[in-house]
């Protein structure tokens, strides 16, 4: 019985991981450019991400006001009955128009996705 549970747990861990693809490192941002636009986020998730980013000094916008430096888009989001999600996040430097990272996730806990967003944005030079 223990071996079966261990095998199921191991399978879940292998399937639940996400992968990060980075394309290039964006140029350093200045203090006034520490702005991010969130695109296509569910309202409750958007609120939690906004709160975490604001704690780190980011100005967060849900709409296009034209003065953001970074865009984080949430695409192909599908949630299961337990609230775990599948989809991907696309990180774009709006100063150059280039995508600099993509985070694909399967069967991910929203808290882990939220932490990954903060981690990726904080890795930008100057952030």
Where are the regions that the model predicts?
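C-terminal/domain-edge helix-coil "capping" segments
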Residues: 18-31, 44-58, 98-127
